[in-house]
Amino acid sequence: LVSPFKDTIEHHISTKIILLNGSNRVLGVSTVSEGTLSYNITDARFILQLAILSNCKGVIICINQPSGDLEPAKLDDELVEQIKIALSYVDVDLLDYILYCEEDYYSYSDNGKL
């Protein structure tokens, strides 16, 4: 997971979306937003737009954490709910929401939060 995003992993928060078809094959990867070292705004509408334009069936959201703090914040939980609701209207699944740094990651899916 870390390798494709290595250029920004320690410099600033960046949100990426992995777009998948019905067989979970990658259709594409896109940058959703980029922020500062400690702050980033991710818009669920832009994620929905990318999902519709790619005609995907599932998405994985990946957000690097330059600080190394992988504990999900309340804002992460709220964003996950917004994304799930938005995607449900167009029959697209949120397969995972991943916070990661160079050494480790936190997966909402692995932790039963989806």
Label for each model-derived stretch:
Residues 1-27:
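Long amphipathic N-terminal alpha/beta scaffold segment
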Residues 3, 21-23, 33, 37-114:
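Active-site-proximal loop/helix of nucleotide/amide-processing enzymes and allied scaffolds
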